[in-house]
């Protein structure tokens, strides 16, 4: 839809919408319209200009020193600038209204970052809504649409433009390091666009350096927010991988209304997860490319709340489980297209075996009990695959774990301990409560999968918040185990040393960068303060530092989908 120039034909309502938006933006920046007066420098303002993405710079290094404020003004500027860019995509790059706003923002830039005021935070949160209202008012005036229809058009147009902007930005490998007790650990998040054997990514529908953000909820061709997550330690002059797994958004393209297309899309996403899992096993991938039909074991851990009372995640879980079931019938072999080192598509044959779990980890599941019964109906079957039919804690493990232990591997004790912990959790329904550790079952399932040479994969709805916290919990426990050679007891809070590890992981795992990649702002929505307090999960106790907790929360509360 072509929208003509605003100034010569604007209706009164359109003018009012613009003035409201202008007031919100300008007041949020604490400048006077037309004067470009910069905000006064706060007493605790840091003197340097903050520049992220410079060589060696990470969100962790930056946020770790943000002791004086919940939100950085620079972060709010960046978020608002991105939203104006999206609006300009809808209204036109030369739109005089948005150009005026952008110019005012340039004038309002400060030379040093400082804590944002509550007024600035409110303005940043309201800007998206106000931009949509401006687009709606202009659309209504130009096309004579009813107000509701114009607003619906504006919301869809803005969302589509925002998704396109997020998808088309470069999706690149994120690599951060942390040091604890003299050991150097590297956290690597490798996006689908950089899962390459040669010059191109391995997927038949190439990513070409781009990605699929968590808000692209109708995409039936690609998995959302697909990454390979690795943590390694440098010792004896070389890097040793402690853990490698695949993370992603839910397999359901849940805003696709056609049930056949939605299921086809879920299966396409599942195939991409399998391709990524194969990529994470270079030796197995080479055998497949040489023509061998290879077996691939994958432990999928969904983190959704399997209920439709809030958010329809129950239906999403059903879509995901149906996709796994369709691809993993007993004895079934599937053919995947993989782009080889020469850039040519090659068919590989795999026999996938997927143990598909779903473990609710949010307040709805762990505080109110939503979705637990539905999830456990899937979990019982998956546990039998993983641990055999006898799930008594004292019983010898069967299933995949029993097969692994029969080889008397070097990690026999670790595998046996993790298996026993999982069976204890299951027997006592500890995964139904926070109990000081919301991810107690999910995290141990992923760790056990890695230890028995299966591929761990995990996801929530978006692949960034609960998925990111799972990623951090796994890495916290792995680094702690590497240092102490002891696994934490289920439901235990980290001690002071464990909290220090967790704090470093939360800020340097790459998860803040992934959240920014998907939404335009870094911050994890898992971190929240609810009322009454009894509804809150145990993350303030687990993190042990209010400033770190706020840094991990970031500007997530200001971002709306």
Swiss-Prot record:
Q: State the active site.
A: 460
Q: Where is this motif: CX5R motif?
A: 460-466
Note one Pfam family from the annotation. Answer: IpgD
Which keywords does this chain's UniProt record carry? Hydrolase, Secreted, Virulence
Q: EC number(s)?
A: 3.1.3.-
What's an example GO cellular component term for this entry? extracellular region
Entry-linked InterPro entries: IpgD/SopB
The molecular function GO annotations come to: phosphatase activity
Per UniProt, the enzyme's principal EC class comes to hydrolase
> Where does it primarily localize?
secreted
**Where in the cell is the protein located?**
Secreted
What job does this protein perform? Answer: Converts phosphatidylinositol 3,4,5-trisphosphate (PtdIns 3,4,5-P3) to PtdIns 3-P and prevents the transition of PtdIns 3-P to PtdIns 3,5-P2. It is one of the known effectors injected by Salmonella into the host cell and is required for invasion and for an efficient generation and maintenance of Salmonella-containing vacuole (SVC). Alteration of the phosphoinositide composition of the plasma membrane causes membrane ruffling and actin cytoskeleton rearrangements.
Q: Which family does it belong to?
A: Belongs to the phosphatase IpgD/SopB family.
Q: What is known of its domains?
A: Contains the consensus sequence Cys-X(5)-Arg characteristic of Mg-independent phosphatases.
| Protein name per UniProt | Inositol phosphate phosphatase SopB
Q: Which species is this record about?
A: Salmonella typhi
